[in-house]
UniProtKB/Swiss-Prot annotation:
Protein name as annotated: Phosphoglucosamine mutase
Family: Belongs to the phosphohexose mutase family.
Function, in words: Catalyzes the conversion of glucosamine-6-phosphate to glucosamine-1-phosphate.
Any Gene Ontology biological process: UDP-N-acetylglucosamine biosynthetic process
GO MF, one annotated term: phosphoglucosamine mutase activity
UniProt-listed Pfam families: PGM_PMM_I, PGM_PMM_II, PGM_PMM_III, PGM_PMM_IV
GO cellular component: cytosol
Annotated CDD domains: GlmM
Amino acid sequence: MKKLFGTDGVRGVANVYPMTTEMAMQIGRAAAHIFRNGKSRHRIVIGKDTRLSGYMIENALVAGICSMGVDVLQVGPLPTPGIANITSSMRADAGVVISASHNPFQDNGIKFFCRDGFKLPDEMELRIEELIFSGDMDSMRPIANEVGKAYRIDDAAGRFVVFLKSTFPKDMDLSGLKIVLDCANGAAYKVAPAVFEELGAEVIAIGVKPNGTNINAGCGSLHPEVISAAVKEHGADLGIALDGDADRVIFVDEFGNEVNGDNIMAICATDMLQKGTLNKQTLVATVMSNMGLDIAVKRAGGRVIKTAVGDRYVVEEMQKGGYNLGGEQSGHMIFLDHNTTGDGILSALQVLAVMQRQGKRLSELAEVMFALPQVLVNVRVAEKRDVMTIPAVAGLIGDIEAKVKDEGRILIRYSGTEPLLRIMLEGQDKYQISGWAKEIADLVEKNIGGSKVG
């Protein structure tokens, strides 16, 4: 059982355990020791988003890593997939991302990439934790002339821009397209506008003035209403919203209607099926994806495999099965032919390429999938008990499942990063499933304590 690492690294409120400078230094020390194999000089890339606490945590990590004889390459604010890409392209031993993704600025996190750009497997996270809590690290310190050095890589953002543009078809450009782009005042505030503008689009950029405390604040992928209003105001062709570390993306079409991760997976999967480029005719999604996605892909001659929630589990399944497209309803999209992790900007480029190639507007492309009505209720809880051990809750869920049968489904799971129980229902009648979701939430509140969120 891991004590620090969750589904997406170590995460919490900045300056509160475990996101303290003391723990960040220990994480840096332990990771550096584990990645330090052989006698050659070793290097770890560190990047971050735009949170105020990023400076504090970065300095602690740098100190910890250097104290164990490993050099640090600091790339500054850069999207999470950019850090994965730079780690691999610079042949570093590992990459570290300081970010809490879509969470508010008060939170922060630390997650690692291996030298190949893929996220750290569970067993390596466990090794880092074991070393931290073993108390053995003081005896592992190198002597003074063997400590590491820290360097700044000033052209990291430019390198990533060049890489992203290389994933767009060379015989196409974006001239004639007007795009509203929301960078969430986060890590992509410089990179994303540059990519789309250099490919010829007219870009109306918002969320590009980070101040340390406004990341994800009323903007970004969790607030599609912002780009929806801007698309209507400017008569744009579409809107693109990234989150704080730009590993996910949400769209709105020319009418301001949201096009979520399921829609995007359906668009890309069916296009790749038509071209014969979808490996094994298979898309990898999570259990949160709408049943309408399964129907759309099956109709096009493919299939959908479902994993647990979390882009790391999607990537693991893709690697294991040799698949090249996967993603989540939340907007994480993984194109393994191009990158090793969820990449909002790269995903947007692939969708734009489909639009240009097929000569269709986004609203037309989105018609490939019709989503079943879906309701999601979050309940904030004090403890993460197995709700199926509560007779009243288990009984109610069983009754609802019997009524839904094959025309819908119930999914109940705890968030991997927050103290939330997520209750999701799909079915033919939205009003009916909304009532059922509320019934389950009320029973959970009564038996575990807590309150509904959103």
